[in-house]
């Protein structure tokens, strides 16, 4: 998949599937969700790709479709930027995990390496690991005498 993205051809993540790509670059990562442009000039520096869900890449069929795909890619980048605007690393980690849990099932998210999420929001992989644990701790019910 990384070779396809680095080929220089503009491709589009299939907008009809609940899927996407985490595109790993040297010092950061970017998420491209359904309908987003990948490849072309955007991703010449792609080092690896993590496929989320049942992802499929397609060639844009028209200039309008290319334009729309660029717009969608920018929207995904802006969403990640909103998370990185928070100064606390734990908050950034929690936000990216919450966002992915809204869109993807728990099993899919569990397969994404901590390092990939970390590169999306500029935190250490250990911060993601700790946030995953705190998000999925079972809540303890305190018994009172009335119970």
Set out the residue ranges of the language-model regions.
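DNA-contacting interfaces and partner/effector-binding or oligomerization modules
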Residues: 1-58
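Residue-level detector of alpha-helix boundaries and kinks
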Residues: 19-20, 78, 102, 113
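Short, well-structured alpha-helical interface segments that form or flank functional binding sites
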Residues: 27-33, 88, 126, 130
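Short C-terminal domain-edge/linker segments immediately following a structured domain
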Residues: 45, 82-87, 125-127
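Low-complexity, flexible helical/coil segments
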Residues: 49-51, 92-96, 118, 130-133
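A small-molecule sensor/coupling module
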Residues: 60-95
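Short helix->loop/beta-hairpin flanking segments within DNA-binding domains
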Residues: 86-110
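Phosphate-/nucleic-acid-contacting segments
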Residues: 101-147
């Amino acid at each position: 998949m990384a070779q396809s993205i680095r080929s220089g051809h503009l491709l589009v993540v299939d907008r009809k599937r609940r899927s996407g790509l985490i595109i790993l670059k040297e010092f950061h990562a970017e998420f491209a969700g359904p309908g987003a442009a990948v490849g072309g000039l955007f991703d010449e520096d792609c080092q690896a790709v993590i496929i989320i869900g049942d992802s499929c890449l397609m060639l844009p069929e028209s200039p309008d479709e290319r334009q729309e795909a660029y717009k969608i890619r920018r929207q995904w980048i802006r969403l990640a930027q909103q998370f990185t605007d928070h100064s606390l690393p734990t908050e950034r980690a929690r936000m990216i995990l919450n966002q992915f849990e809204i869109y993807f099932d728990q099993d899919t998210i569990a397969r994404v390496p901590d390092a990939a999420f970390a590169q999306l929001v500029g935190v250490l992989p250990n911060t993601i690991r700790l946030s995953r644990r705190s998000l999925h701790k079972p809540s303890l019910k305190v018994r009172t005498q009335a119970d």
